[in-house]
Amino acid sequence: MTRYVALLRAINVGGRTVKMDRLRALFEEMGFRKVETLIASGNVLFDTAARSAAPIEKKIEAHLFKTLGYDVETFVRTPAELAAVCALQPFADSVEHAKASALYVGFVKAPPAKDACARLMSLGNGIDEFRVHGREYFWSSLKSMGQSKITGAAIERALKVPSTMRNITTVRRLSAD
């Protein structure tokens, strides 16, 4: 069995409320084992014999659509992959942003195309800066995300694909499992 983390987009925001015990039950219905949730923002840890993330993502998305009645984009990583993300220093070239008060990690299903990366990077404004590494992007802000003029919707428009974000503290907690 392999341990995975499902990062669900837009759970418990915008009126899409799902209690964590219900979410765990939905994952158990799919045959996943040792299902746990971490904070009420769509982070689900589970074990499965499946070896590839893409079919797991599709299975979860189909089941959640069937049971909840709306699309839930799902991004699957292993705890080891998340630990590798946490070990990166994407802003090492910037003294200010290397020590920024807010660092978020965004997840997409496949590495963005070069033009998408360029569009994302162009959102940077000195206060908010971006870096892309594989299937993740990093958003460093000298303020809090709530004070930023950049939105998740603007990021998705730049990337032209759905994504979900977590703060680095949450990613560290998910990687420690």
Please provide the spans of the model-predicted regions.
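Surface-exposed, charge/polar-rich loops and edge strands
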Residues: 2-41, 45-177
